UniProtKB/Swiss-Prot annotation:
Xref: InterPro entries: bc1_Rieske_TM_sf, Globular_prot_asu/bsu, Rieske_2Fe-2S, Rieske_2Fe-2S_sf, Rieske_Fe-S_prot, Rieske_Fe-S_prot_C, Rieske_TM, Ubiquinol_cyt_c_Rdtase_Fe-S-su
Full protein name: Cytochrome b-c1 complex subunit Rieske, mitochondrial
GO biological process: respiratory electron transport chain
Organism taxonomic ancestry: Eukaryota, Metazoa, Chordata, Craniata, Vertebrata
Species of origin: Theropithecus gelada
The UniProt record lists the keyword Cytoplasm: no
Cofactor note: Binds 1 [2Fe-2S] cluster per subunit. Fe-S cluster delivery to the Rieske protein is mediated by components of the iron sulfur (Fe-S) cluster assembly machinery that reside in the mitochondrial matrix (including HSC20 and LYRM7).
Stated family: Belongs to the Rieske iron-sulfur protein family.
Keyword Nucleotide-binding tagged: no
Miscellaneous comment in the UniProt entry for this protein: The Rieske protein is a high potential 2Fe-2S protein.
Length: 274
């Protein structure tokens, strides 16, 4: 009856098939089997990522189709239309959104933009690091009041001509000498070839009559004696270094001249050291 209904063409919707079963004493020779209902395909939920490649082998690619014909069993194809494949639209640039267009033409512009962003970020980080290091170093430096105490003001009118006076500056001995005209001419006439540490007398003074030196021997740090030695300047009693009136090493183991500190004349009779 089913085959007749299938072959009846336009009359198939109004035809119906009926059958009756009568219980008998004999058992059938062959047991009737009920065909198993095919299960719809199930997606593998163990896959951690959803992409076009991972879903291409599991989801049905064709739309929902139902086909029927004479002497042909009916078939149904299922299509999962609720699966959203990510396209990364929000993460791509406008130049590469079109998958059918080559991205080679815009590669230089995109690289330039990336380089620009990297350079700006690097400069910003370097500037921030520089400020942090500068503030850290400044926090360890001496404050303004400490620096003010590191300066000493000397009244030159208290030092007679030809004499040397010692002061204490930053924990070091400071020599201030008022030279005579003879001493000025004598030191200016010294040949630089005779000096171990060549330096002209005028390069060590701001006023020829005043010599300001740090009274520490450049050999091992002893304090020299003023108005002593073979050259009438300074003499170190520790190891016998002789300095002239300009503080230049002339004899002995000391390798360098006496150090000249920074100083400035505020008036004819006043000098500030430091």
């Amino acid at each position: 009856m089913l085959s007749v209904a299938a072959r009846s063409g336009p009359f198939a919707p109004v035809l119906s098939a009926t059958s009756r079963g009568v219980a008998g004493a004999l058992r059938p020779l062959v047991q009737a089997t009920v065909p198993a209902t095919p299960k719809p395909p199930v997606l593998d939920l163990k896959r951690p990522f959803l992409s076009r490649e991972s879903l291409s082998g599991q989801a049905v690619r064709r739309p929902l189709v139902a086909s029927v014909g004479l002497n042909v069993p009916a078939s149904v194809c299922y299509s999962h239309t609720d699966v959203k494949v990510p396209d990364f639209y929000d993460y791509r640039r406008l130049e590469v959104l079109d998958s059918t267009k080559s991205s080679r033409e815009s590669s230089e512009a995109r690289k330039g933009f990336s380089y620009l962003v990297t350079a700006v970020t690097t400069v910003g980080v370097a500037y921030a690091a520089k400020n942090a290091v500068t503030q850290f170093i400044s926090s360890m430096s001496a404050s303004a009041d400490v620096l003010a105490m590191a300066k000493i003001e000397i009244n030159l009118s208290d030092i007679p001509e030809g004499k040397n006076m010692a002061f204490k500056w930053r924990g070091k001995p400071l020599f201030v000498r008022h030279r005579t005209q003879k001493e000025i001419e004598q030191e200016a006439a010294v040949e630089l070839s005779q000096l171990r540490d060549p330096q002209h007398d005028l390069d060590r003074v701001k006023k020829p009559e005043w010599v300001i030196l740090i009274g520490i021997c450049t050999h091992l740090g002893c304090v020299p004696i003023a108005n002593a030695g073979d050259f009438g300047g300074y003499y170190c009693p520790c190891h016998g270094s002789h300095y002239d009136v300009s503080g230049r090493i002339r004899l002995g183991p000391a390798p360098l001249n006496l150090e000249v500190p920074p100083y400035e004349f505020t008036s004819d009779d006043m000098v500030v050291v430091g």
